[in-house]
Amino acid sequence: MTLLLGSSTKRNEARSSQVSGYASAEHYYKSSFYDVSLIKTPVNTSSYTKTTMQSYFGRVNYSYKSKYLLAASLRADGSSVLAKGHKWGYFPSVAVAWRVSDENFMESTRDWLDNLKLRASWGSTGNAGISAYQTLPMVNADNQIYYEFGSGVTTGRIPTTLGNENLTWETTTSYNFGVDFGFWG
């Protein structure tokens, strides 16, 4: 029997700043076009993104007389990009095999059948490959609205996306059945 235990931690952090705008027509053909001070109505933007992922995993392999084989694993992943209450996912798998060719009743076939193994497996995997902050509603500073408030006009912002408080792990389950065999090896 063999046993494997492990963990991993992943952290991504990104920051950016940008100034954009338009220069007047007279600066398009001059080398000073790249001078930021000539930008008309500059727009400053910046962003910060931080994501983390914590994982724990284990695997056990068991072999009895090299004929009966078992492999089982469990992975637990926690991701900051998913919604509260859905951040952790658990992904088990199991595989079994029977090397039929090593059984006593197969002895008469050993001169031409070197290997005959039946196998089956089942497992699930998870994916949290989405952008950060999709669980939160987003408001874009460019989406201004104007409305009357008392005796004046006030500006406001409207959400560009609604947050999704149900974002969870995308889970894929797979099954595998097979026969391995070898002749005159």
PLM region descriptions:
Residues 1-185:
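Extracellular/periplasmic, surface-exposed regions of secreted and cell-surface proteins
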